[in-house]
Amino acid sequence: MSDFSMETLKNLRQQTGVGLTKCKEALEHAKGNLEDAVVYLRKLGLASAGKKEHRETKEGVIAALVDERGAALVEVNVETDFVANNSVFRAFVTGLLSDLLDHKLSDVEALARVMSSQEPSLSVEELKAVTMQTVGENIRISRALYTPVSSGQSVGIYSHGNGKAVAMVFLSGSENQEALAKDIAMHIVASQPQFLSKDSVPQEVLEREREVFSSQVAGKLQEVVEKITQGKFKAFFQEACLLEQAFIKDPEVTIQGLIDRAAKASGEPLKVEHFVFWKMGA
């Protein structure tokens, strides 16, 4: 039987900001004494972290990893750019990627509950508290994504600005087109498309754009309106859709043209299945 009440456990969690498991451990070690439990957590480097949890976090890093387990992406924020480049913080972020891949998670709350691959005796939430204590700043895991990688897929990752923006591209038809996938990922970071293709643009977006275009040519003859509207839609697709965009490294060819050229050269049926683009704080 425990030597402490649920009320004491609740008070310890509120006072320290430390996770449930470690608070139980502390109270068991302290035989139910709240003050001794706080001291125990402080010795572990956990207790003072809770005081930092309400500080604003505007800096940080977006990190990505792909291996035989799949592909993972995580955004982790801190207070200053100095800590964002700190080796301890970066190691914590790298560990999160491995945790996402191990557990196939895209949920931040679920990630916080799993045991850390870096420090198996601690949950991710508890290791975050230890890392906060070490770097002296608040840390917030903002978002996470796990995506399985199928056989016959190539995945390209491009990171810009030391992790301020990251794109990940999933290319089907070959496992040997990482360079092409990375080139497309680099293009995505530079051009920031909203959609993959014309067919993937939601109907409500098309209707909104048509309404805007129509208002711009109100009063003109119908055939003129149609011609102008078609031209405006073409320009919209070229700006908003990845496959319609001019390749940043060779504007004479579209991204679809680039893929077709590579497919012809390799004899492989290459296709961009989907992409992910994250920008810090967006």
UniProtKB/Swiss-Prot annotation:
Gene3D superfamilies: 1.10.286.20, DNA helicase RuvA subunit, C-terminal domain, Elongation factor Ts, dimerisation domain
Region feature Involved in Mg(2+) ion dislocation from EF-Tu, mapped onto this chain: 80-83
GO cellular component: cytoplasm
Pfam families recorded: EF_TS
Subcellular location: Cytoplasm
Cysteine disulfide partners in this protein: none
Stored PROSITE patterns: EF_TS_1, EF_TS_2
SUPFAM superfamilies documented for this protein: Elongation factor Ts (EF-Ts), dimerisation domain, UBA-like
Keywords from the named record: Cytoplasm, Elongation factor, Protein biosynthesis
Gene Ontology molecular function terms on file: translation elongation factor activity
Task performed by this protein: Associates with the EF-Tu.GDP complex and induces the exchange of GDP to GTP. It remains bound to the aminoacyl-tRNA.EF-Tu.GTP complex up to the GTP hydrolysis stage on the ribosome.
Family: Belongs to the EF-Ts family.
NCBIfam families listed in its UniProt record: tsf
Protein's name according to its UniProt entry: Elongation factor Ts
Organism field: Chlamydia trachomatis serovar A (strain ATCC VR-571B / DSM 19440 / HAR-13)
Taxonomic lineage from the root: Bacteria, Pseudomonadati, Chlamydiota, Chlamydiia, Chlamydiales
This protein's encoding gene: tsf
